[in-house]
Amino acid sequence: MTNETTKTQRAIMAVVAVIGGLYLMLLAPTQAMQTLKIALDQVLLRLVPHDADFYPAVPILSVTFSAWIIAFVFAGALLLVLSKKLYEGAKWARAAALGMFAIPSVAGMTMMIPWFVLVLSEYPEKGVPAHTVTGMPPSMPILFVSLLFYFIMLLADQDTLKNKMLKVVPYTLLGIVSGMVFMNGQHGARYFIHIPGEFVTDASGLISVNPTPPPFTSPLAHYITNLDHLDWRTFDMLSDKAVYSPQTLALLLGGFLLYIASVLLIVSIPLMAMKNKVGWYMATASALATAVVSFQGFVVRSSTEWLQGGLLSSVLLVVLLIPAFKNLLIEKGE
């Protein structure tokens, strides 16, 4: 980003930082928590009794939503502290503010998908009753408010129209890919930690806790070894003898590596805004890693979500390597 800004632009950025900071500290956490509670209520009462595969969504969403909520408060506090420096025209403050608004922008995206999958979607083939909640999630404003402030921070300078149009591409893709790989990470982590033997279908046909789960000494009780004995689609027993399953590695990388990459992509945004080469290398490596892992997940699990994630990561990788974009993100020759 160029550091050439007018007094009006600096005032706008300072006001945006104050409004955005207050929003992230005072309103966004409540909106996110309301979304989480409604989603978990639907999972526990509507979905899990008919399909135990949904249960891992409970700990996964509890942890990730909580992490985002905590990040909102810290980001909001930093934005308030940065507002004076933004008005003074400090480039580093603007880069930091851009990164702070990237956090809720990505988080807002990741909070939409669980709502559609767990709250609004119908699963009649599993015997799941119709949904009782309608409309958009309470967290939806987080996405759009944060995106608005994100682009104000990105574009409020005296750069040429051409350069502004060019830099919108990588800075938008960074957020989209970060959100996409995080959502795919939810899917991977959900199935990675799932232990099917902990659940059983009772006499009424509903899912309940298995009164005699696999003992802790059994490979069926561990998330690294259980799929070597089970059919990964139905979780039926295949063999007492371990048969190496590529599913475990695909889920590990397609879950936790994608989580880490999502965070690294967010961190790279303020670094590249300062034309720090570490940010570009971080983002490029993350795009490459997530492309490879996502395509691997698609091959192993035939998951179209991972195919989409792999394609988006590939697009980001190409964009970061194109000189017209790269020269806006780091100094020439680095």
Spans of model-derived segments:
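Topology signature of small-to-medium multi-pass alpha-helical membrane proteins
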Residues: M1-E334
